[in-house]
Design a protein with these regions (language model features):
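Alpha-helical elements of the RecA-like P-loop NTPase motor core of helicases
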Residues: 5-6, 60, 117, 158, ...
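Structured loop/turn residues at secondary-structure junctions
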Residues: 54, 111, 152, 218-219
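Generic alpha-helical structural context detector
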Residues: 64, 121, 165, 229-232
Length: 239
């Protein structure tokens, strides 16, 4: 994969005008852009940009709103993620980690994710405050990100949901759905992520509030749609 500025330079050398990497960049200098969250940092002079990952896109708007409205002290995210093409169809020796060699369609497989680190490039004010993990599950598409955060303010679940409903009821890049959906319902959705208010939960003890918020996403199509929005904006400012 051409997932660093150094390797992506080959595309520019071959005649491409711009490069948008469809994965987290493996260097510290390439900007990471999620449309609707920080796409306005793009400049016409930028030549190589990362769109992050599907999981980064699913949670970026959620993280930014929580931080802007209530302040995030720290947090942990888990993506319950559809299996991907990098996994095994059948058990067999391929990867150094034994778990990664197990058949994807019949196992829940703990996996790493770079989304928590990448989110710090998209929302710099939370850089270093989040950690993350993935569970690859037995579905071919349709994923969900659970974000647990300790907030700076005391807040209720209703207040969190109201903030998300106001912000995202009518945006193309991030959605809001209170219909009690499941993972198959999200397949074909064009948003980078869809907030599910029915799963919001809050626990406040001695003035400290911990909140659980959830975002569904089509990890294939939804991510692609949001990446295309970034690409179109990139092209527009580069004309």
């Amino acid at each position: 994969f051409y997932t660093s500025a150094e390797k992506s330079q080959a595309h520019l050398n071959a005649g491409a005008k711009k490069v948008l990497i469809s994965a987290p960049a493996k260097d510290e200098t390439t900007p990471t852009v999620v449309f609707g969250v920080n796409h306005e940092i793009l400049k016409a002079s930028d030549n190589i940009v990362s769109a992050g990952s599907c999981t980064t896109n699913s949670m970026a708007a959620m993280v930014k709103l929580l931080n802007d409205k209530f302040g995030i002290k720290l947090g942990f995210m888990t993506t319950i993620h559809a299996y991907t093409g990098t996994q095994m169809i059948l058990d067999g020796p391929r990867f150094p980690k034994a778990r990664n060699n197990r058949a994807a369609a019949i196992n829940t497989i703990p996996h790493s994710t770079g989304a928590a680190k990448a989110i710090g490039k998209v929302v710099p004010s939370v850089n270093g405050k989040l950690q993350g993990h993935a569970q690859r599950i037995q579905v071919p598409d349709g994923s969900v990100t659970e974000l647990t955060t300790v907030l700076n303010k005391e807040v209720t679940a209703d207040e969190i949901n109201a903030a998300f409903k106001e912000a995202f009821s009518n945006t193309e890049y991030y959605g809001y759905n209170e219909d009690g959906i499941v993972s198959s319902d999200i397949i074909g959705d064009t948003h980078g992520g869809v907030f599910d208010p029915t799963q919001t939960d809050v626990n406040t003890v001695d003035g400290t509030t911990m909140a659980r918020t959830v975002s569904f996403y089509d990890n294939e199509y939804g991510f692609t749609c949001n990446m295309i929005r970034t690409l179109l904006y990139f092209a527009e400012i580069s004309e």
